[in-house]
Amino acid sequence: MNTTRHRLLATASRFVETLESLDVDAMLAIRSSTCLHHMCCPSFRNYSITNDQTREAFPQWKATITKYKFGVLDDSQILVDEQARKVMIHAETAAETTVGDYNNEYVFILRMAEDCNTVDEIWEFYDTIRLQDLRHRLEASHVPIGVDAPAPFTTTASPAAL
């Protein structure tokens, strides 16, 4: 049975698989051409990036990772809103980087396209203390990261209300 719920969950599953793959082409293929990815942590930095900005910045981020695992923390906690075409995922990552281990937890809210086969919008929430620790270690090793990297990388406006 190919219900809306089934299609939403299948797309969310592919989203998670592409994040774990660290394959930027696969990561962007699951997204619509107009997808916006909102980083939603006001105590750290709020910003939104386009697919082009993701493609541009990703190689620099990937270069810091030597081993990576990403996945859903608890399948029973996945929430689906069929009418809004949204799926919420609680996920975790465990990575070895050029400056030591990095572990974090995330909540992703994915809004799918009308056909439920691609992601139109991503809201990402994460533990800012853990990310800040990684950033400090990267900076101490003189490794630029993310939006502070020297690559041409500008952000769009803050995310709209969920």
From Swiss-Prot:
Q: What happens when the gene is disrupted?
A: Impairs the synthesis of austinol and dehydroaustinol and accumulates the intermediate compound preaustinoid A3.
Q: What else is known?
A: In A.calidoustus, the austinoid gene cluster lies on a contiguous DNA region, while clusters from E.nidulans and P.brasilianum are split in their respective genomes. Genetic rearrangements provoked variability among the clusters and E.nidulans produces the least number of austionoid derivatives with the end products austinol and dehydroaustinol, while P.brasilianum can produce until acetoxydehydroaustin, and A.calidoustus produces the highest number of identified derivatives.
| Superkingdom field | Eukaryota
Q: What is this protein's name?
A: Austinoid biosynthesis clusters protein J
Which family does the UniProt entry place this protein in? Belongs to the trt14 isomerase family.
Q: How does it assemble?
A: Homodimer.
Give the matching InterPro entries. Answer: Fungal_Meroterpenoid_Isomerase (IPR050977)
What's the source species' lineage? Answer: Eukaryota, Fungi, Dikarya, Ascomycota, Pezizomycotina
Q: What does this protein do?
A: Part of the gene cluster B that mediates the biosynthesis of austinol and dehydroaustinol, two fungal meroterpenoids. The first step of the pathway is the synthesis of 3,5-dimethylorsellinic acid by the polyketide synthase ausA. 3,5-dimethylorsellinic acid is then prenylated by the polyprenyl transferase ausN. Further epoxidation by the FAD-dependent monooxygenase ausM and cyclization by the probable terpene cyclase ausL lead to the formation of protoaustinoid A.
Q: In which pathway does it act?
A: Secondary metabolite biosynthesis; terpenoid biosynthesis
Gene name linked to the record: ausJ
- One annotated GO biological process: austinol biosynthetic process
